[in-house]
Amino acid sequence: MARWGLFGYNSATDVTDQPWFVQPREVYAVTLKAVDIEVTIRGFTARVDASLTYHNDTDKALTVQYSMPVDEGAAVYKFEAVVDGRKITAQCFEKKRAEQIYKDAVSSGHTAFLGREDNLTADIFHLALGNLLGGSEAELKLSLLMELKVKTDGAVSFTLPTVLNPRYCPKDVDASHHNTDIVTPFAHPESVTSKPYTFGLKAKVQGGHALANIVSHHDILIVKPSDDNMSAEITQECGRFKPDHDWNMLIYYQNPYKTHIIREKGDRSSTGLMKDDLLMVNLHPELPEQSYSHRNEVIFVVDRSGSMQGEKMQSARTTLLLFLKSLPTGCYFNVICFGSTYSLLFPSGSEEYTEQTLEKALELHHSISADMGGTEILQPMKHIYSTPPKPGFARQILLLTDGEVFNVDQVKELVSRHAHETRVFVVGIGHGASTALVHGVARAGHGLAEMVYQQDKLQLKVMGLVRSMLQDSVQDVSVTFDVEPPGGIKLIPKTLPIIFGGKHLILYVRVPTSTEVKSITVSGVVGNNKISNCFNGSDIVNIHDEEKTLHRLAARAQINEWQIDNEEDVAEEMITLSLATGVVCRRTALIGVDEDRKPVGPKPESAAGSPMMDLSLTPMCMTSMSFRVCVMYFILIRIDSDLGVFIYVYICKSWNTEQYST
């Protein structure tokens, strides 16, 4: 797991012409001095400003890198670096152009930094800072935006990911699509900070919602509400946070289910999306009881890979047990466990839910452990889709996993292709679970996702998902507007929403600046019943936000939607939207160059210090076994001087024998 670790290699070392596993370079830990986080929550959105201060204790100019987890729905839009008092502000460019600018700047001796989303998964962000002088201090400032949803128990959950676990790279994934120039923290234990550093977190909750409570299951918070309970300030005592879990805070509003519509003013001097106004519609549609059916086929897909050891497997077993005992009579079910291979509880297909079949499932439940190797999630999903749903029954898949894989796009594409006949619900297990897979697959499969930890109210979350699974799909969904003058209204993304009874639904709507919105109607058909939710324009709250939070969150929602489909068909649109809003996607990057400072020393003969290294695979992409992770860390630390040789031997052994798990 990553603990905000930054590490560097000598900028005078040429690493561009040799394979990564024999690179003749030294790797140095760069001391982390302080982490300061400021969070501003307004209703159902959050802005996070993270500041990380590092010091290069060596006497060498280093090119330093770090990888950090982010929520897959977060809009990263601003990056700054302050190096020895000089501020460098990044701009968003097309990725290849940004990489070339960075390479040219660093090879010329300038200090520069480059921020990129991982090529294979949207929940990892990489940063390279070139030519950090010996004895220099660097403060890295990242700003991102997040949408927050009301959970089953009525809490608005804010999570700041701080745990970055190794990701398994399946055998059929083309590793060349990974960020081949990134030195990941999984390969270098030096990047996991062991020295003490200060951690400060301040949060503000405001935005017109009366507060009932603010709590955390993991951390001790100091909460100071205002006299009218319309806002609060939250702090965490310095030194009290241990970065072995994702930082989470639950906000309870007094009336979280009330429809809330915000109109954010656009930038009149801009063009496109940023010029127009943006509506954020928050609603909780209710469905009639007749919308829920027992004629369902539920297939549980349980991750038993090595990364699920310990608390994760305990949570998975508890969650599975609750689901098994919550199924209604008359439905059909099956359980598929997977790792490097997969196995079925009922090999011939789903069977009716009876006392006898439940007893067989409980016997399997008692024996479940993290003993099936790698995380080959695609094959069991393909097996399910290879047979049609039972006639007259709606098929639902419930996936329980930590999501620690790199083939997220493959899984999402497969699930999306079959979403018309099979819905997919996902339960993300444990801290550091991949939000890109958990939320991305649920979205692609027209389902819902929940993240669970040991301390969670599991029963409440399980019952909420069971109720959603048993709900018939809402058909013929439409969103209509009564506006003056007519026309010009656009949903972002264009895809119509998936509606679940009582669940928080968020819509983004692009509105021309001169248009008056008189009413909004969301309607559909479920079973033989028509449903309709109508809202008056008088309910809209107008705001002016310099950060353009809603505009950028809408852009991120559109980018996520595009990345489910054939991305190549919309590549130009994705780049255009990213550049216009500053929201980074996998085809763009943030680049900043210190043009004012004189170059650092003589220009190297080649692009020394460039991040463009030949890294075809990182060691930890080859395994999902926690045991092997621990052994690797231990050996690397003990034979630091032979780091490159050891990794070469280890990876070649794994590659030749295809030992992807212990």
Identify what each model region corresponds to.
Residues 101-112, 269, 293-309, 321-331, ...:
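Short, charged loop segments at secondary-structure junctions
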Residues 360, 416, 432-472, 476, ...:
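Von Willebrand factor A/integrin I-like adhesion domains
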Residues 1-43:
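N-terminal, polar/Ser/Thr-rich
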Residues 37-47, 54, 131-137, 498-500:
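Short, solvent-exposed beta-strand/turn "edge" segments of beta-rich domains on protein surfaces
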Residues 633-634, 646-650, 660:
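Aromatic (phenylalanine/tyrosine) cluster motif
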